[in-house]
Structures are given as structure tokens and as C-alpha cells.
Regions:
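C-terminal alpha-helical interaction module
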Residues: 1-329
Length: 329
């Protein structure tokens, strides 16, 4: 884990000494928008029009934030329009790399061996963390965005005129409700597991753990009565929650000490996770080998031995029985 300082790579773990042991996530820096006609989006500059083959997505199969973009890319049928590169699961002194390994897809555009080199191609004096996903514009040789929550919204609509599959996962009539769910799920669950795992004081850890499980308890009740977070329709809110739920029992329970309860202990949440996993196109985006090996092998401050647990055994393909809930909401 490292960062760039004025374009120079530095191997440095998160500093929690000035935050009372609390992990504080840095904000994404590249916030341009890919739009159907190249007009500017809510942030950044314009000029990034949807075109087949112009853009490239860099991801880690381990990362829940990158996983969001892979799922929406699959749901919208964009696999042929937006090719991908996949970094190695191990994040060492050089950060994300394209070292040889199962599932790794090298960079065909700039030929970089380390992801931080792509960042400095886009901005030579860049300072900040080097994260995935990265949406790259091959035409202008720059990063369009490294903010996953915005990339999935670009994928949701920008390519609709170029043969994208039908489906709107952020419909106008539901946006306020989706945003309200995201505003709870992101800080307490998506980022909450990291706040637990990267905490360096007992107080900071417990401060994150309580709202995490309060939110999971509330979602268990919500999903007992309806198939998806917003009712009978799959939305981006479900995608954003799923990537954390999938990693919870294999990684976060043990590695991040999120062990009050497992997702398997929540009947509705566990069935919901299996339901989403079995949604067409989603299972192909999941690589549990990358997920487990990344966390347990890369985070030396948390797991210095690098030993990866063999379990747990989870059958995400088992029947979920949630189909009937679609007719009840």
C-alpha cells in the first residue's frame, strides 16, 4: 500500500496517528464524466463521448469498489465495448501491479507494469493514493475517472445509444430513494468494514463496529419483506451493497474483526446475497481466490504471516427462494 507524492512513488501505509486510530478514506481525484455526447457531467471537464473501443477499465478482482464497475458493465452488456485489464491480487511495495498470475490481464494501452505509472501518465505530478477502478481514455491518454460510484452511473446510461443492454439501475423516479439507501450503506457498511479493519485503537474499532451491525440488522428486516433494497426492482444500491456482503464472511469477519455476526447468520441477507450472485452475469465477475489472497497476503500490518484461511465453505449457488418476493412488493 503506497501513494504518489508529486509523481514519486512512496511505499506508505495509512497514517492513523493523527486521527485517533481511525481510518479516513481519501477522496477520488479524477472526477470527469463519460457521457453519450461528450458534454460535461456533474464534475470535471467534458470531451469524453461514448465510443466503442475508446475506453479501457482497470480493475482488481479483489476490490469491492472495482467490483461494482464490473457488475454494471456486465449487466449493461458492455464487455465488448469496454475492455478491461486486471491487476495482480497482491499489493506490495509497488502497489497494484500486472505481475504474472492467475486472472491477471496486462495493460495493452500504455504497457505499464505498475498501476501508479498509469496515474503519472495522466498527471506527471499527481499526489495521492493509486486506486482501482480506473476508467482510461485511450484517445487522450488520460484518466476519465477513478470514482467507482460515478463510473457505474456512466455505464448505466452513456452507451445506451451504442448497443448497451436495456436496463436502468438509477432511474429518475427512484433516485432520491436510491441515494438515501446509499447514504447509509456507504459509511456504515461499504466503508464501515474498512474502518473496523484498519482501526488502530480499540475505541476507533468499536466506533465503527456498532453502526456496521446496526445497519446490517436494519437491512435484514428490510429484505425480509422485499426482494431488493428498493422493492422488486434491482438498482445500483443493490450492486453497491452486494460487493461488501460477498466479501463479508470470507474476509471481513476474520481479517477485519467484523465478527459479531456473519452474513450467514442473517437469513434474509444471506439469501439476498445468493440471489444477486445468481443474477445473470454477476457470478462471472466474482473471483474469491483474488479476494481472499489480496486481503490476507497484502495487509501485513493486520496479518503479518500472510497465511490465508482455507474456509469458509459457502455455496453462493444454493437456492435462495426470493423470487416470490418480487410479486409481494
Amino acid at each position: 500500500m503506497g501513494l504518489l507524492v508529486d509523481g514519486v512513488w512512496t511505499d506508505q501505509w495509512y497514517d492513523t496517528s493523527s486521527t485517533g486510530g481511525r481510518f479516513e478514506r481519501s477522496r477520488a481525484v479524477f472526477r470527469n464524466w463519460l457521457t453519450a455526447d461528450g458534454s460535461p457531467g456533474p464534475t470535471g471537464r467534458g470531451g469524453f463521448a461514448a465510443e466503442a473501443g475508446r475506453y479501457h477499465l482497470y480493475v482488481s478482482l479483489a476490490c469491492p469498489w472495482a467490483h461494482r464497475t464490473l457488475i454494471v458493465r456486465a449487466l449493461k452488456g458492455l464487455n465488448d465495448l469496454i475492455p478491461i485489464s486486471v491487476v495482480h491480487w497482491y499489493m506490495g511495495k509497488d502497489g497494484w501491479t500486472f505481475a504474472d498470475g492467475e486472472g491477471v490481464i496486462p495493460d495493452p494501452n500504455e504497457g505499464v507494469e505498475m498501476l501508479h505509472q498509469l496515474y503519472t501518465r495522466a498527471e506527471a505530478t499527481y499526489s495521492g493514493r493509486v486506486t482501482v477502478p480506473v476508467l482510461w481514455d485511450k484517445q487522450t491518454r488520460t484518466i476519465v475517472s477513478n470514482e467507482s460510484s460515478e463510473i457505474i452511473r456512466m455505464f448505466n446510461s452513456a452507451f445506451d445509444g451504442l448497443g448497451a443492454r436495456e436496463g436502468n439501475y438509477y432511474p429518475a423516479a427512484m433516485r432520491s430513494a436510491i441515494d438515501a439507501v446509499n447514504d447509509v450503506v456507504y459509511p456504515t457498511i461499504n466503508n464501515g468494514v474498512y474502518r473496523c479493519g484498519f482501526a488502530t485503537t480499540q475505541a476507533a474499532y468499536e466506533e465503527a463496529l456498532t453502526p456496521l451491525f446496526d445497519s446490517l440488522d436494519q437491512l435484514e428486516q428490510r429484505l425480509t419483506a422485499q426482494r431488493y433494497l428498493l422493492g422488486s426492482e434491482l438498482t445500483e444500491a443493490d450492486v453497491r451493497l452486494f460487493t461488501t456482503l460477498l466479501r463479508f464472511d470470507p474476509v471481513y469477519v476474520g481479517h477485519f474483526k467484523c465478527n459479531l455476526r456473519r452474513i450467514a447468520d442473517y437469513p434474509a441477507l444471506f439469501a439476498y446475497t445468493r440471489d444477486l450472485y445468481q443474477h445473470p452475469g454477476v457470478a462471472a465477475t466474482v473471483n474469491l481466490n483474488h479476494i481472499k489472497r489480496h486481503y490476507y497476503e497484502s495487509h501485513h500490518t493486520i496479518n503479518p504471516t500472510g497465511v490465508v484461511p482455507v474456509g469458509p465453505e459457502i455455496d453462493y449457488g444454493a437456492p435462495h427462494g426470493r423470487e416470490a418476493l418480487s410479486t409481494m412488493t
